[in-house]
Amino acid sequence: MDLAVALERALDARVVSMRSLRGGDVAEAYRADLDDGRRVFAKTHRSAPAGFFTTEAAGLAWLRAPMVVAVPGVLAVSDGDTGAEAPNHLVLEWIDEGSAGPSTEADLGRALAALHLTGAPCFGREDRRSTGSRGLPNEPCPTWSEFYATQRLLPLARLAGASGVLRASVISDLERVADRLDVVGGPPESPARLHGDLWGGNRLVDRNGRSWLIDPAAHGGHREFDLAMMRLFGGFGEACFAAYAEQCPLADGWVDRVALHQIAPLVVHAIKFGGGYVGAATTAIERYR
């Protein structure tokens, strides 16, 4: 069964056209037009691990639930549970992209602050589903320091060691950072509702200048993590961060912790891409060892 047939069964409508979309580095993405007038976004990942799209769909629904930030609605999801012949897929409502307006960045900052303030029941995920291409664990943890150490830094240290991308001395430094999070991590905070992979490519702007969040690695975490990701890869204006801080001020010393929260994504990228990410990850790790 091809993807078009799977979509027709899931959406109870005939696919009249499908167009491949560029930009995804993991899944194959498509725009599909249906005979009932709907246009949808669909993607498939033929070598995805078990539960890949179900996890993403749950994350999207969790971010969407408080109704404080725009997140595309999930129309259908399958991880191949309808039969081996049916490709796995995730179908979302279509967002017509446009250009940012004068208030786009500030509006996103306020919306993200509101999202974080809705909170999470734990650090991690209650459903314990792993996220991301590296399958990082999300076991529920009572504190951020325990979560970041046991569910991010230490698993990444093992992956980096196995891949050989980081020197043994840097792996030891990373393990030392995991042990020092109570010292370098700032004051304790309650778990925030995080997007978890918030770089510029995971934000769409529609024709009204409204920001939409996509492709999350959603979990309960430290709100500084989302903001550190946004600063790491760019794509967000200073008006966004200023509006966030006005709505939800950060604890003293947050500037000195930005690189701490960037360690995890930098190591992930070092493992995946090598190159300059290896040096950037090493620099961040050595800063907090």
Label every model-predicted segment.
Residues 12-19:
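Conserved N-terminal boundary motif of the eukaryotic protein kinase catalytic domain
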Residues 259-267:
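Hydrophobic alpha-helical segments that form the core
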Residues 142-149, 158, 190-193, 200-259, ...:
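Active-site Asp-x-Gly
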Residues 21-146:
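ATP-binding pocket architecture of kinase catalytic cores
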Residues 2-4, 8, 82-83, 120-193:
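An alpha-helical support segment within catalytic cores of ATP-dependent transferases
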Residues 269-289:
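ATP/Mg2+ or Mg2+-diphosphate-binding catalytic cores
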Residues 80, 97, 154, 211, ...:
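Activation segment
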